[in-house]
Amino acid sequence: MGANVAYLVPDRFKYGYGLTPKIADVAFSTFQPDLLVTVDNGISSHAGVERAQAHGMQVIITDHHLTTKETPKAEAVVNPNQLGCEFPSKALAGVGVAFYLLANLSSYRSQSGKSSSKVAQYLDLVALGTYADVASLDYNNRILVDAGVKRIRQNQCRAGISALLEIAKRDPAGLKAQDLGFVLGPRLNAAGRMETMDIGIECLLAADLQTAYPLAQQLNQLNTERRQVESQMKQEALSELTQ
């Protein structure tokens, strides 16, 4: 749609969870953006929103977490679980909320005669994020996951997803929803647990298989290392119990 987009995945141990004032500072100093959009966080980030706005940024919060407090004074807050929201599907994962924001933006631009994005192309990511986040599969989430799985089976998906499935020796044509959570999810999550989540993001953003495959290989190796570390920790814990 013409926007110059960059992402920032904060280290929660260093900066805290969500849109904190420190993260607003980092976003400003690194990118100097006009607009800051949160994904899967921000519903309680009053101070962070204020700091971002003090830097001259507009803020859109997309989140799905429950709250009993007043929402931050951002330019827009998109959350089916915010107080007073009548959106019927309360079980949306963060990726689902972001998808509906994009769908509505695309529809608005199309009706205004402006260029818009075909949002169906993102359903593979929506399905992956919904299932891997263990969101409740209510009626709406089942539709989103089913649509995304069908696109992956037809090879209408990110090159990164295709690369991960190839490395895991999974045939996309026979993909099951469970594979999103038990084949793709662990490999992507291993990046954040062992190194940095950027590897997983770059894999999913890769424009072609040639770019995605080396990143998918890194993710697969990190997942192997994660499993080894977890197994060792389990053995050490059991050893302590038997002493």
Regions found by a protein language model. Give the residues of each.
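Short, well-structured alpha-helical patches and their helix-loop capping segments
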Residues: S44, E86-G94, A120-L123, N140
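Catalytic-loop motifs flanking and including active-site residues across diverse enzymes
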Residues: A93-L101, D124, L180
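Hydrophobic helix-and-loop "lid/oligomerization" segment in the mid-to-C-terminal part
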Residues: M1-L35, H55, K73, S107-Q243
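Active-site cavity-forming subdomains of large catalytic enzyme subunits
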Residues: D25, S29-A91, F99-Q111
